[in-house]
Structure formats: structure tokens, C-alpha cells
Amino acid sequence: MKASADASSPQETTPPLSLLLFVANRPGDEEETAAIQAHIQQLPSNFSFELKVVPIGEQPYLLEEYKLVATPALIKVRPEPRQTLAGRKLLQKVDYWWPRWQREVALGLQADMQKSAAEQSDCSMELSRLKDELFQLRQERDRLAEQLQFKDRIISLLAHELRNPLTAGGIALETLESNLQEESSQQLPIEDIQRLFHHARSQTQTMGQLITDLLLAARGPQDKLQIMARQLDLRQLCQETVEDVRLNFERKKQHFTTDIPLDLPLVYGDGDRIRQVLVNLLDNACKYTPEGGKIHLSAFHRMTQKVQVTVSDTGPGIPIEQQEKIFGETVRLDRDRAIEGYGIGLALCRQIIRMHYGQIWVDSQPGKGSCFHFTLPVYS
């Protein structure tokens, strides 16, 4: 491509080869200037170039700036370095340097392309790095959101669990208080008074454990519930737990029975945690079973070196499609709407039993009650 003596418009790309032709505008110089322009314009060029004619008379300060000693003079401004051709045989000098200038332009464009490619590569790497950082930040955001949700769920869950021992302990203390106001002939036997005191103390200990769990949960999901498993007399634990919740059944005139064999083997577990599971299952059975209904607690030794515990009731039952979902942390069934509580204690039960390498599940039919089962490993 060849350029005229006119300057390129601002919208056009700057030509890689830029030339200035300085002339003195003496009489007769017009023909020489035109001849030089015509000669340069017809030279073969693989690149666009611009040729500007600069009259020295109009801009004399350029003589000093470009250090000109004679005219006409041709200065290569771009590509750098700057080069000046002047004096006699100017056109021959132009013919000599023209191919070299073409090579300079080619090398410069190649270098620019390589630089551009390198810059694009750097930009791609930077973009990739920023994408990685964005991905990590999103992961961190999701992790923090999950921690907050976990904390809210577990605190709500454990706060709900506090209701059970608080209510049971309160009933025991109310009974003791009422007993003090009765006439001596109507007061409870000393054995019942001792049982009520033991019951209140046991519920207080349970609340202390739950408060510890609340403080632990406040630190986030990285601090899981602690299991201190050891040899455990499950039969005795069941009997103690039954005594803790018996008053709840009596208040609703429910028929509560047990079937726990004397030769039930010892299990491997955390007594406080298994007590939580038993209390939760028995409390749910009490809540969902109508007045005068039946609740049964049983345990037996399975052939798979597991002990299975079952809590059955004559409550409304659970639809088959909901029986797995009830162990979720936020699930609440239609039957739960009128019952106080969050309905999320079963999630804690499942977590505890799984940490004992056991299983927990439910068998139920709507209108026919529910049977909650869990297993624990036999101690060996």
C-alpha cells in the first residue's frame, strides 16, 4: 500500500513507516519536491507509509530540532531510530535505504506481534488466575454460609432438646413441692421422694450435657459432637431413662410397657448420648400418642452382634414416602404443626447412632402407629 503526501485521518491506523520531507520553498524547488514525492510513491512497499512535506520557511524551529544542515532532506521518523537523508543524490540514497527500511518495518511488526501474543498470554494467565481466585472465594463464601446454617440448625436442635429434661425436671420438682403441702397422711412414701429427687438431678445433668453441646456447636461444624464410647449396661440405662420420662406418660394416662431381657449383653456406647436418643424417641412417642394410648420399649440381642432397641406407639403413624425424610434436620410433617417443638431431634438421633456404627430407622403406617428402631454394637 502506498500513501499520499496527505496525513492519515485520525480513524486510520498509524502507518508503520513515517517520513518527513523538508523543503526550503525556493524558486524552482516545487518541481524537485514533486519529483521526490513521485519517486517515493512508486517505490515497492509491503506496508503502508506516510510522507509529509514540511516547508522550513513556515516552521524554522524544526531546523534545530532535527539538526538539518541542507534541504531538501528526508527524515525517517518511524520506525526508530530516526535517520536523515540529505544532500546530493538524495533519490539514490532513498533507493539504497528503502529495502532496509522495509526490513526494519517487518522486524518491528513481528516484534509487536510477539509482544502482543506475549501480552495476550499474560492476560490469559492473569484471567485464569482471577477465575481461580473467584472460584476459591465462592467456595469460601459457600463454606461460611454452610457453617452459619449448620450453627443455626444445631443450636435450634439442641435448644429443642433442652425442653425434654427441663419439662421432666420441672414436673418432678412440682410434685415434690405439692407433697410438702399435703397432710402427713397423704404425703408420698420416702422411696417415691428419693426417686423424684434422683429424677430431677438426672435431668439437670442432662441439661448440662446439652448446654455443653450448644457451646460446642457454636464453634461450627468442624467441632462435631463428642462420643465417649465404653462398656455400657443398656438394660440399666433403659430402666433409668424410663424413670426419667415416666411422669410424662402418667400425665397423659398412657399405658407404658417394657420388654428388656435380663440377659441383654453389654453394648459399646456413650451412655449420655444413648440416653439422648432414648429420651427423644420416648418423648416423641408421648407427644404423638393420644391420651390412653400405648407405648412400648423393647430390646433384644440380634444374631449380627448387635443389640436392637425399639420404641413403638399407637400414634397417627408416618406415610411411607416421609419415613426417610423425618431424619433430616429441617423436615417437619403435617402431623407436627399443632405440636410444640421443632421436629428436628431425629436428625441428632441419627448422627449419634451413626457415630456408634449403628443404624436407626422407622416402620410405620398411617393410622397404625410407629416403631422406631436403632442398633448398637455388642461389647466384646
Curated annotation (Swiss-Prot):
* Modified residues annotated as Phosphohistidine in this record: 160
Q: Which reaction does it catalyse?
A: ATP + protein L-histidine = ADP + protein N-phospho-L-histidine
Q: From the Swiss-Prot or TrEMBL record, what is one GO molecular function term?
A: phosphorelay sensor kinase activity
Entry's Gene Ontology BP terms = circadian rhythm
Q: Which residues form the Histidine kinase domain?
A: 157-380
Enumerate the UniProt keywords alphabetically: ATP-binding, Biological rhythms, Kinase, Nucleotide-binding, Phosphoprotein, Transferase, Two-component regulatory system
* EC annotation from Swiss-Prot or TrEMBL: 2.7.13.3
- Its top-level enzyme class, in one word, is transferase
- Post-translational events: Autophosphorylates, probably on His-160.
Span list, region KaiB-like domain, interacts with KaiC: 20-101
What would changing residue 160 to A do, according to UniProt?
Answer: No autophosphorylation, no change in oligomerization, no change in stability
InterPro entries in the record: HATPase_C_sf, His_kinase_dom, HisK_dim/P_dom, HisK_dim/P_sf, KaiB_domain, Kinase_SasA, Sig_transdc_His_kin-like_C, Thioredoxin-like_sf
Q: Which GO terms describe its cellular component?
A: plasma membrane
What HAMAP family does the database record attribute to this sequence? Kinase_SasA
Domains as described in the record: The N-terminus (residues 1-108) interacts with KaiC, while the C-terminus (109-380) autophosphorylates and is probably responsible for self-association. The N-terminal domain stimulates the C-terminus to autophosphorylate; KaiC does not stimulate autophosphorylation of the C-terminal domain.
Name the PANTHER family for this protein.
Answer: OSMOSENSING HISTIDINE PROTEIN KINASE SLN1, TWO-COMPONENT HISTIDINE PROTEIN KINASE
- Function text: Member of the two-component regulatory system SasA/RpaA involved in genome-wide circadian gene expression. One of several clock output pathways. Participates in the Kai clock protein complex, the main circadian regulator in cyanobacteria, via its interaction with KaiC. KaiC enhances the autophosphorylation activity of SasA, which then transfers its phosphate group to RpaA to activate it. In addition to its output function, recruits fold-shifted KaiB (KaiB(fs)) to KaiC to cooperatively form the KaiB(6):KaiC(6) complex (independent of SasA kinase activity).
Assembly behavior: Homotrimer with a small amount of possible homohexamer; a protein fragment of 109-380 is also a homotrimer. Interacts with KaiC, probably as 1 SasA trimer:1 KaiC homohexamer; unphosphorylated SasA has the highest affinity. Homodimer. Binds to the B-loop in the CI domain of KaiC; SasA and KaiB(fs) compete to bind to the CI domain. Binds preferentially to doubly phosphorylated KaiC.
What name appears for this protein in its UniProt entry? Adaptive-response sensory kinase SasA
Q: Organism source for this protein?
A: Thermosynechococcus vestitus (strain NIES-2133 / IAM M-273 / BP-1)
Query: What is the gene called?
Result: sasA
